[in-house]
């Protein structure tokens, strides 16, 4: 049933792609059709986790899962249409009698007409971004559990280019002297390291739902007792911090990145907690450590910031 559900969802996507390709042919009422479409794709492990969470871990079949597939397909793919009308001119000729020459003559006319252009926008809202806006807290927790284990079916979608496999978290031992030098930083790390290995869940902000990047940083600062940030996004966390030059960054500072979500998303898009020696702990995929000297993080680095309380 898992593979059948994936096949059914992929079939819906193929139909949508065909609809976009043939939009002009299927809408002859427009003089011109312009289509701006996001890539049509989904991670099949995310789909499996959504279905399983919606059934609260109980058995399901393709037939019983179809309403869930339909619901999330409509949430994921949004098609909007707008029509503009332009005033254009065409050239026509007609025969007219010229009384001066007493002859019929061909006259060229510039005739106005309405030219309709249909602008079609297909937005892919990313299937993994939908649980937070469509599930209860309990169901989100179930979703996070399935994302952490892939339902113990890792490899079932082998060969699917959009299937993101489970990864082991990167581990790192913070030097004892670094922890001993700052009880505040030690409190942060005592809280942060509880969640190593938890999956990245868009919109997640608690151990029950797991975390996204800003949810993780917010939760760790708040529940370590260092500083109550509330639940903020990455940009909101940056606004709380005072700027710190990279050369003066200290363990416990927050490190911010930009451009990690691809084109079209401006500003700060990711954050983590700096732990010294060029390392950070963050909600990646999964929560773990990362080396800031890696080419990827260097290319997306935005700034360091220091929270109140540090």
Region locations from a protein language model:
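Intrinsically disordered, low-complexity
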Residues: 2-199, 299-310
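Solvent-exposed, acidic/flexible segments
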Residues: 178-185, 209-214, 248, 265
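Catalytic cysteine-centered active-site loop
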Residues: 198-251
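Aromatic- and glycine-rich peptidoglycan recognition patches
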Residues: 234-235, 239-247, 261-310
